[in-house]
A protein has these predicted regions:
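ATP/NTP-dependent adenylation/nucleotidyl-transfer catalytic domains that generate, transfer
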Residues: 1-82
């Protein structure tokens, strides 16, 4: 998506995905578009995500992401990693 890939960025993405899995989102993908972090989860889990939105946003900002978004299309395994 035009975002330069670095080991530091990959480590932050991995940390965010692992943390979300620990919070009860077993199917999750984080995608980075510049300053935007796009979170993909199963659509069935959207209400759980919204209930935890403040906690999730705080954690993702702690990891260094600026703008945190939930992808309205849900998890899609066929798109690019970053």
């Amino acid at each position: 998506y035009g975002t330069p890939i670095s080991f530091e960025l990959l480590a932050r993405v991995d940390a965010g995905e692992q943390w979300l899995k620990e919070q009860g989102f077993p199917i999750v993908r984080l995608r980075v578009h510049g300053d935007i972090l796009r979170i993909e989860i199963d659509k069935e889990r959207f209400s759980d995500f919204i209930a935890m939105a403040d906690k999730i946003t705080a954690k993702m900002k702690e990891l260094g992401f600026v703008y945190i978004t939930l992808d309205a299309e849900g998890f899609r395994s066929w798109t690019y990693i970053l």
